[in-house]
Amino acid sequence: MTDYTVHIVDDEEPVRKSLAFMLTMNGFAVKMHQSAEAFLAFAPDVRNGVLVTDLRMPDMSGVELLRNLGDLKINIPSIVITGHGDVPMAVEAMKAGAVDFIEKPFEDTVIIEAIERASEHLVAAEADVDDANDIRARLQTLSERERQVLSAVVAGLPNKSIAYDLDISPRTVEVHRANVMAKMKAKSLPHLVRMALAGGFGPS
């Protein structure tokens, strides 16, 4: 059993129980919460925990939950689960403090690896991995077009919208996006968004 607890926040009981069962079978200590409000009331007592929350919930969304945790100065590594293509909301969650986001549907290994990465924040700040000065230096290597594409990605725009706005083909957007990922040494889209925000680079 892990020495930290995974807190699952989802308003749908079958989803909550299914995820909890899978994680328990893989050696994680788990606690379930039926709503963002329920977890927020419990959060001050959390010690050594990782939060996995659904993004879209009634009454209080995952983004609002993260913002409330921030207002309360409660620092818990958080992962948000989003619907496919819900990148704009996921980006808002990253700005609110999430360390990762995962799109549905996902394989068990994807959420397990995300939780293990998030748990590393319990012992080491991410700044140790991606120094802000290094990130700004990488941003300086981007071409003007690459910076435009990155800005659109951080804004949560899909490739087709970026292509339309910049008057280029979707394939060209994919090429620029791949170049940005390589120059920024980003392991994934969430990692790229985190670095861009840490480097002070937001949507134009």
UniProtKB/Swiss-Prot annotation:
Residue(s) carrying 4-aspartylphosphate: D54
Pfam families, per database record: GerE, Response_reg
Instruction: Tell me the InterPro entries matching this sequence.
Output: CheY-like_superfamily, Sig_transdc_resp-reg_C-effctor, Sig_transdc_resp-reg_receiver, Tscrpt_reg_LuxR_C, WH-like_DNA-bd_sf
Q: What is this protein called?
A: Transcriptional regulatory protein FixJ
| Gene (UniProt) | fixJ
Recorded GO cellular component terms are:
cytoplasm; protein-DNA complex
What does this gene product do? Answer: FixJ, when activated by FixL, induces the expression of both nifA, required for activation of classical nif and fix genes, and fixK, required for FixN activation.
What biological processes does GO assign it? nitrogen fixation; phosphorelay signal transduction system; positive regulation of DNA-templated transcription
Keyword tags: Activator, Cytoplasm, DNA-binding, Magnesium, Metal-binding, Nitrogen fixation, Phosphoprotein, Plasmid, Transcription, Transcription regulation, Two-component regulatory system
Cofactor(s) required, per the database record: Mg(2+)
The residues that make up the annotated DNA-binding region are 159-178
Binding positions (Mg(2+))? D10, D11, D54, R56
The HTH luxR-type domain, residue ranges = 135-200
Q: Where in the cell is it found?
A: Cytoplasm
Q: Which Gene3D superfamilies match?
A: 3.40.50.2300, Winged helix-like DNA-binding domain superfamily/Winged helix DNA-binding domain
Q: Which GO molecular function annotations are given, in alphabetical order? A: DNA-binding transcription activator activity; metal ion binding; transcription cis-regulatory region binding
Q: How is the cofactor bound?
A: Binds 1 Mg(2+) ion per subunit.
Domain (Response regulatory): give its ranges.
5-119
